Amino acid sequence: RFIIQEGERVTKYYIHMNDSYHIIEPDYEWCDVYGCVNANFTHCPKEKYPKLVSLAPSFGIRYETNFLKAAINTMVTLSSVWKSVLRKSEWNKATQKNECNKKRNIKHFFTRRYKAWKNRLPLSAYDNEIKSEDDYVFFLSTLWYSDEWNQNDKTVNLRRAHYVRVCKSIPGVTFEGGLLGDAFSSNQLFADVYTDKRETFANWLEKTKRSAFVFNTPAFWNCHGWKLGEFLALGKCIISTPLSNDLPHPLEHGVNIHFVEENELSIREAVEYILAHPDYRHKLELGARDYWEKWGTPLASLNLLEIRN
C-alpha cells in the first residue's frame, strides 16, 4: 500500500504481488488503483473491478549499493507507516503491544533484509551484453511439492521436466541444470531431471545470459513465474507454454516469444527449430527486450498505474 498526494488530490495504491489472481477485497475497497502482477480479466472482469490494472511479472532488484543506506531508508519508511497505523487504528492496547514487540525485533528485521539485499542485483545487471551461445542451454528451476489441490506434478513440474529431457537428449547441445527439489517434492517420476547443484544468483544470471534460449511455463497456482519478467528484461529467446493470466499487453508468438503446447513433442520441435534458425532466435531476443522496455520496467509500471513524475 502507498499513498501519493498532489496538492489536495490524494490517490491510494495497492500492489498485489501474490501468485493468485483472486482480488483481496478489503485492499481493493481501500485503494483507488489496484495493480496486480497476476491479473486475470476472465475471472476478475474489468466490469466488476474497474480499479484493476495489469502489471508485468516482477522480480527483486537491489535498489541501493550500500546495505546500511538501504536498511535506514526502509526503517524510516516503516517507522512512518507504523506510527500512522497505531495512531489511526482501532486495535486494543494489548494487540498494539504485541505488534510493536514484533516490529522491535531488529535482528530479525536486518537479517531478512540483508539476505534479500545480498542475493539480488541492481537493475543494470539485466542490461545483457553477453551474446547467447549457439549450443549451450542452462535451465535451473524448482521442483514444487504436489498435492491434491495444486497438482503440480501434472502441470508445472511435468512441463519443466519435458523441457529438461528434450534439452538433454539433443546431440551437440551442452545442457546444464535441472530441477531442484526437497523432501516434500521428491518424486521418482522426475529422478532423471533432478539436480542438487545450486547456483548463486549471480551465477544463475550469467549462465542464463549465455543460454541459447530459456523456458517459461505458468508456475505455482498457474501464476506468472518471476523468471518470465527476468527473461524479458534480459532479452532472451523464450520458449513458453500458454500463459494462464493476463499481461499489460499480450506477448506475440514469433515476435517476442515462442509458444508451444504442453507436451514433450511440441517443446522438442521448438527447441530444434530455434537451434537451426539463429536469426529467428535473435529476433525473439530483440522482441523480448523491446516488450520489457515498453511494459515491464519500473517506469513502465508507474505509467500503467498512471503515476507521473
Walk through the language-model features, giving the residues of each.
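Catalytic binding pocket for nucleotide-activated donors in carbohydrate/polymer assembly enzymes
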Residues: 189-193, 204-308
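Nucleotide-sugar donor-binding catalytic core of glycosyltransferases
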Residues: 1-222, 243-249
